[in-house]
Amino acid sequence: MNRPKVQRRVGKYEVGKTLGQGTFAKVRCAVNTETGERVALKILDKEKVLKHKMAEQIRREICTMKLINHPNVVRLYEVLASKTKIYIVLEFGTGGELFDKIVHDGRLKEENARKYFQQLINAVDYCHSRGVYHRDLKPENLLLDAQGNLKVSDFGLSALSRQVRGDGLLHTACGTPNYAAPEVLNDQGYDGATADLWSCGVILFVLLAGYLPFEDSNLMTLYKKIIAGEYHCPPWLSPGAKNLIVRILDPNPMTRITIPEVLGDAWFKKNYKPAVFEEKEEANLDDVDAVFKDSEEHHVTEKKEEQPTSMNAFELISMSRALDLGNLFEEEEGFKRETRFAAKGAANDLVQKIEEASKPLGFDIQKKNYKMRLENVTAGRKGNLRVATEIFQVSPSLHMIEVRKTKGDTLEFHKFYKKLSTSLNDVVWKSGESSGLSK
């Protein structure tokens, strides 16, 4: 286990673990070595971008996003390129995902839900005014900063998840239909603004109710419910909240409430604080032009450096609030898409136990040394769930197991982890047991 670990650098950024992965892009945590600031690094494969004729669309959207400077939108700092990759440097949401709050605490109090919804509408309205649409609003895109303010990610980068066909209309293959508007599912082409607002309505419903308005184990039945606008509000919703949700979740995009009308709604306006920020007059687009002109003189330097494996795993565990599985999702520097716990036994035995626990849950498993990638074989109605695990040695008989989501629905990840943790309960190291460390 005491093998060297590869440390990757891209220009001034020291690249860390994978946070998420899609068809065209992978997102990694990184640190700006000049400032110490944590960032998210979205990595695109140039070959795939060119193959799907997406270069010009992505270039336009990146140029637009560099002009966006809103407190509720994840900032796009700069764009870099190597010979084979494009790197988009983004603001890092240190407070984790908003929907982790739902998983931990259940539905939110109305005043808290309203605050987040107001911030969401602020972000969406501002971006729409600049001609930028999201088209894929879902829990994974709703992050929090260190102060607990909402940050919407992936605004303007919709070319990575959409297709424009010969009719000139927007068409999306939707991996998470629960949040998609009826006109998106009908695939007849749609307006990005009204579709975004529908998704905001679904998000508001979940914040207030603690569950999805449209849910069914059968995908076709789910589609029918969404297209018909068939859902039921829980009895605890206030009349004002219910009225607004009904007006947003109108299956007819022509009669659906608009954002200006939402801003004038009595329930929405309560304790409303408009976003305060300074507009950028201009943004430097030289880095974007250099990336898409593919000028070799502007290519960023990529380095891989070998470093010894960190031996502070036990310190990390000791610093945690609890060492057992009662605290399922520990924060690591504020980010909550992962959990970790101490486990007894040899590393190879732990790998086998994780494999044995995951296979009955329908996961395909890839192993490389003490890292594993788990993916559910058949995508459900919420798309594929991908999970990465890694085992770190503390002593020959004590290890730290890290489990993190790399793709998919947050709620599904939490469900998977609970099942996995139950299966591994016999090997979890509890506080007070012998650690196997020499005194």
UniProtKB/Swiss-Prot annotation:
Q: Which domain of life is it from?
A: Eukaryota
UniProt-listed Pfam families:
NAF, Pkinase
Role noted for this protein:
CIPK serine-threonine protein kinases interact with CBL proteins. Binding of a CBL protein to the regulatory NAF domain of CIPK protein lead to the activation of the kinase in a calcium-dependent manner. Involved in the calcium-dependent regulation of reactive oxygen species production by the NADPH oxidase RBOHF.
Name the gene behind this protein. Answer: CIPK26
Q: Which residues carry this modification: Phosphothreonine?
A: 172
Which residues are responsible for catalysis? Answer: 136
Phosphoserine is carried by which residues? 158
Q: How does it assemble?
A: Interacts with RBOHF (via N-terminus).
Give the span(s) annotated as PPI.
Answer: 336-365
Which residues belong to any copy of the Protein kinase domain?
Answer: 13-268
Which terms are listed as keywords in the entry? ATP-binding, Cell membrane, Kinase, Manganese, Membrane, Nucleotide-binding, Phosphoprotein, Serine/threonine-protein kinase, Transferase
Look up and give the organism this protein is from.
Arabidopsis thaliana
Entry-linked SMART domains:
S_TKc
Which intervals of the chain are annotated as region Activation loop? 154-183
What PANTHER family does the record point to? CALCIUM/CALMODULIN-DEPENDENT PROTEIN KINASE KINASE-RELATED (PTHR43895), CBL-INTERACTING SERINE_THREONINE-PROTEIN KINASE 3 (PTHR43895:SF104)
In the record's own words, the domains note is: The activation loop within the kinase domain is the target of phosphorylation/activation by upstream protein kinases. The PPI motif mediates the interaction with the ABI (abscisic acid-insensitive) phosphatases.
Q: What is this protein called?
A: CBL-interacting serine/threonine-protein kinase 26
One annotated GO molecular function is: ATP binding
Provide the NAF domain boundaries: 306-330
Query: Where is the protein localized?
Result: Cell membrane
Q: What is its main location?
A: membrane
> Catalytic activity, per the record?
L-seryl-[protein] + ATP = O-phospho-L-seryl-[protein] + ADP + H(+); L-threonyl-[protein] + ATP = O-phospho-L-threonyl-[protein] + ADP + H(+)
The catalytic activity of this protein is classed by the Enzyme Commission as 2.7.11.1
The entry's family comment says: Belongs to the protein kinase superfamily. CAMK Ser/Thr protein kinase family. SNF1 subfamily.
Cellular-component GO terms for this entry:
plasma membrane; plastid
Alphabetical list of InterPro entries matching this protein:
Kinase-like_dom_sf (IPR011009), NAF/FISL_domain (IPR018451), NAF_dom (IPR004041), Prot_kinase_dom (IPR000719), Protein_kinase_ATP_BS (IPR017441), Ser/Thr_kinase_AS (IPR008271)
The UniProt record gives the binding positions of ATP as 19-27, 42
